[in-house]
């Protein structure tokens, strides 16, 4: 049997994980600057959590969910998105309690799972940064979180992103728009795709999100939700736009954008980049004020986004952004002979305890081969350890580029390597 990874998944080897670690470090710093705290939730949850949160007519539920019955007869689903799990954790752990400071600001970095046709930027197991801000409704919250995403992109050096903005209004506005959309689409019912015909009376806003060519042509002239906003929804959206402009964050209004999930209201947004002539969404989110209450929690306004890490890496590669910091190694220990094996192990551990990054040879190879390995690993210093060095206690520490070397003792290295390290670099412009 030939063992292979499942379709739609990827192995992240060390050269790739170095990029991921770099991005994660930058993201963690940005989220921390905005006072967001990390949350970790289970990779699988009750199927009902996701089906109710994302909507029974959503593509996630009807086509993409990985779900199964476990050995206890429970209907379980692998996490297709992060917001529902964060909301469940918020309710279950009573983060709505008055003693908890509001807003509750959470972020996560986690794998998600959707059964989709694998293609560039769309895997069946993919990874997202997500942020959720719960407990306060204020246009400034919406804009702060959009600005946080913008800050992350800028710190990573990503360019060419466009911010698309829309509002779905409050419940009153959405209901008025829903009826207008049904009235518009009904005469075209027989021309719509099968999915859109099914959604027409259940959730007509979902037709706007269709990727089918026949649906796109029909909704092109559909009424816009902006024409059905009540005064409160209009005022809220105007303040969001004013705050974005105050921060000099450029945006365009996309009146047909609805996002792919049912729980949104008011502000929604996407960061989009041109990728090989097509629009690629790398980050999207919005306000979801009814979701906590929908799951029997207290009425809780909330706003958040998800950001695809694989897509971020695709864009960076396209823009020739190098996320890999130069790999260096402080010390490489070249080992000569079996008798040096024990001392090399002790020396390596001693140096690591002193906060130096160390590698050693394990294969008892010729010195030339070991020096080549040190070069490949980017080792700055080399210590050669053989029977003579062990017998006399005297060793040489050599710089791998300048060839400058310092003679010292094994005892001195064990006691404190820092002065020796500094002596090697003294008077050198390296």
Curated annotation (Swiss-Prot):
Protein name: Histidine--tRNA ligase
NCBIfam families hit by this protein: hisS (TIGR00442)
One of the Pfam families matching this protein, by short name: tRNA-synt_His
UniProt-listed Enzyme Commission number(s): 6.1.1.21
Record field: catalytic activity: tRNA(His) + L-histidine + ATP = L-histidyl-tRNA(His) + AMP + diphosphate + H(+)
GO biological process, one term: histidyl-tRNA aminoacylation
Subcellular location: Cytoplasm
Membership in a protein family: Belongs to the class-II aminoacyl-tRNA synthetase family.
Primary enzyme class: ligase
UniProt-listed Gene3D superfamilies: Anticodon-binding domain, Bira Bifunctional Protein, Domain 2
Main location: cytoplasm
Alphabetized UniProt keyword annotations: Aminoacyl-tRNA synthetase, ATP-binding, Cytoplasm, Ligase, Nucleotide-binding, Protein biosynthesis
A GO CC term attached to the entry: cytoplasm
Subunit structure, as described in the record: Homodimer.
GO terms of molecular function: ATP binding; catalytic activity, acting on a protein; histidine-tRNA ligase activity; transferase activity
InterPro entries named among the record's database cross-references: aa-tRNA-synth_II, aa-tRNA-synth_II/BPL/LPL, Anticodon-bd, Anticodon-bd_dom_sf, His-tRNA-ligase, HisRS-like_core, HisRS/HisZ, HisRS_anticodon
């Amino acid at each position: 049997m030939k063992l292979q990874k499942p379709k739609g998944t990827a192995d992240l080897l060390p050269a790739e994980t170095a990029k991921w670690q770099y991005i994660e470090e930058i993201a963690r710093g940005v989220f921390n600057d905005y006072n967001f705290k990390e949350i970790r939730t289970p990779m699988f949850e009750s199927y009902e959590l996701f089906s109710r949160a994302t909507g029974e007519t959503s593509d996630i539920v009807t086509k993409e969910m990985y779900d199964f019955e476990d050995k206890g007869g429970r209907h379980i689903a692998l996490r297709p998105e992060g917001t529902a799990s964060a909301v469940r954790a918020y309710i279950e752990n009573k983060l709505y309690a008055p003693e908890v400071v509001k807003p509750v600001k959470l972020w996560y970095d986690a794998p998600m799972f959707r059964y989709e046709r694998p293609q560039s930027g769309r895997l069946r197991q993919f990874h997202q940064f997500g942020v959720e801000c719960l407990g306060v409704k204020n246009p400034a919250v919406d804009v702060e979180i959009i600005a946080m995403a913008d800050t992350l992109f800028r710190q990573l050096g990503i360019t060419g992103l466009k911010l698309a903005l829309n509002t779905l209004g409050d419940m009153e506005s959405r209901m008025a728009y829903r009826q207008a959309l049904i009235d518009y689409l009904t005469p075209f019912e027989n021309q719509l795709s099968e999915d859109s015909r099914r959604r027409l009376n259940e959730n007509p806003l979902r037709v706007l999100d269709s990727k089918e060519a026949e649906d796109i042509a029909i909704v092109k002239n559909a009424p816009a939700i902006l024409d059905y906003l009540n005064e409160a929804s209009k005022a809220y959206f105007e303040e969001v736009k004013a705050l974005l402009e105050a921060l000099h964050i450029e945006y365009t209004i996309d009146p047909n954008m609805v996002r792919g999930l049912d729980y949104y209201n008011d502000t929604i947004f996407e960061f989009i980049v041109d990728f090989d002539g097509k629009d690629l969404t790398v980050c999207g989110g919005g306000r979801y004020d009814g979701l906590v209450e929908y799951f029997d929690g207290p009425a809780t306004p909330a706003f958040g986004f998800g950001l695809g890490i694989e897509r971020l890496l695709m864009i960076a590669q396209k823009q020739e952004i190098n996320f890999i910091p130069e790999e260096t190694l402080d010390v490489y220990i070249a080992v000569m002979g079996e008798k040096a094996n024990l001392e090399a192990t002790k020396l390596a551990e001693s140096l690591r305890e002193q906060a130096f990054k160390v590698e050693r040879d394990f294969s008892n190879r010729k010195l030339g081969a070991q020096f080549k390995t040190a070069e490949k690993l980017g080792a700055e210093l080399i210590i050669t350890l053989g029977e003579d060095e062990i017998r006399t206690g005297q060793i040489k520490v050599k710089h791998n580029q300048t060839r400058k070397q310092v003679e010292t003792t094994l005892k001195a290295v064990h006691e404190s390597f820092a002065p020796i390290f500094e002596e090697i670099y003294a008077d050198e412009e390296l």
